[in-house]
Amino acid sequence: QVIGLHEYSNVSTPYQDRNQAIKYMISHDEQSLIQEMVEFDNYTMEQALDRDKFYASVLFTSLGIPMLWQGQEFGFKSGWNDDNGDGNYDDEKLSYRPVDWSILDNENGQSHLDHYKKLILLRKNNLAISKGTFYDLFRYTDQSVIVYGYKDERAEGNDDQVVVIANFSN
């Protein structure tokens, strides 16, 4: 979703209004990114958790209102498998999947939660991110890198700025 910000950065659209767009990485009808990375992309759980932290960092530093889904903030790996081998995931997609709160009892779960807490505080306490003007600075498509930033220009003499460099390559 963040890649799409480039399209709207220099055009007056509702997407520029930080109070209009709801952003999310997963929703109720999708598997978690962690599940997809581990089950389908051959990531280890640790690699998937690190990648999820990166995506969360982009989510919380981009325009709009971030939305989290059940346990995402502590690395809950939710999704479905084709356990009976018939290629039909519908039953499992619709089944009740309670959050596994025991994840918070291990170091990975706590580390993940701490990262999300820091992102929430950064967004809450940094006026450049929460109230500032968005700037689409650079895009290096071949290298899968984007650079964007914010400047709090609400008061004269205020020079609060944030620059985000996001490298999407492995």
Locations of regions flagged by a protein language model:
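Conserved alpha/beta catalytic core and glycan-binding cleft of carbohydrate-active enzymes
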Residues: 1-81, 124-130, 134-135, 139-170
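Histidine-centered active-site microenvironments of extracellular/periplasmic hydrolases
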Residues: 80-91
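Acyl/amide activation-and-transfer machinery of modular secondary-metabolite enzymes
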Residues: 90-100
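Aromatic- and carboxylate-lined catalytic core of secreted/periplasmic carbohydrate-active enzymes
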Residues: 99-140
